[in-house]
Amino acid sequence: MPSPNNPTRRLTVLAMLAAVAFVLSWLDSLIPLSGALPGAKLGLANRAVLAGLYRLGPGPGALLCLLKILLATFLFGNAYSFFYSLGGGLLSFVAMALTYRRCSPLFVSLLGGMLHNVGQVLVAMAVLETPGLVAYLPVLLLCGMGAGCAVGLAGGILVARCRRALHGTPDSQEK
């Protein structure tokens, strides 16, 4: 069995997570929440980013986050969505990378979901020069909490699958 630190194995897991993030971004784009709650998304692809952070570490996790943003923007978005996604993604990933060793995946995901919305509102306030957008933040924070919880709970399954791919352990032996 190859070592979990084997560069080829780690690159393979990173590529698989990037593919998962791409498919989940596509599914996320098919779920129309923006009519009811502008700016709200389920953030399904963040499951893959969370798994990458926990299984591969902050460096590969950051690369995965950037790949997810670039792929989703080029295929499903526009120039504006790139900046909103980048602002939210970077802020949330930095917070998740600073807390993932000390906190549960559920908390880390919850924090990431909320800070993603904070980052997007900050970008919107700068781009639109409208400080009043901060009034929409409580609604987006509630959405971020819900999405973060869902991603954190479901992300645990993906983390376990990545552990299995990296270490070759069956799910029943995981703790």
For every predicted segment, state its role.
Residues 1-18, 23, 135-175:
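Alpha-helical transmembrane segments and their cytosolic interface
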Residues 2-52:
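Hydrophobic transmembrane alpha-helices
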Residues 3, 12-16, 23, 64, ...:
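Short helix-perturbing small/polar motifs within transmembrane alpha-helices
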Residues 6-17, 42, 46, 61, ...:
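Residue-level signature of transmembrane alpha-helical entry/exit and packing/kink sites
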Residues 25-42, 67-96, 105, 125-132, ...:
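Interfacial aromatic-anchored transmembrane helix boundaries in multi-pass membrane proteins
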Residues 32, 49-50, 64, 120-124, ...:
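Alpha-helical transmembrane segments and their lipid-water interface positions
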Residues 44-58, 94-99:
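Generic transmembrane alpha-helix motif of multi-pass integral membrane proteins
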Residues 78, 94, 98, 113-125, ...:
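Mid-bilayer segments of alpha-helical transmembrane spans in multi-pass integral membrane proteins
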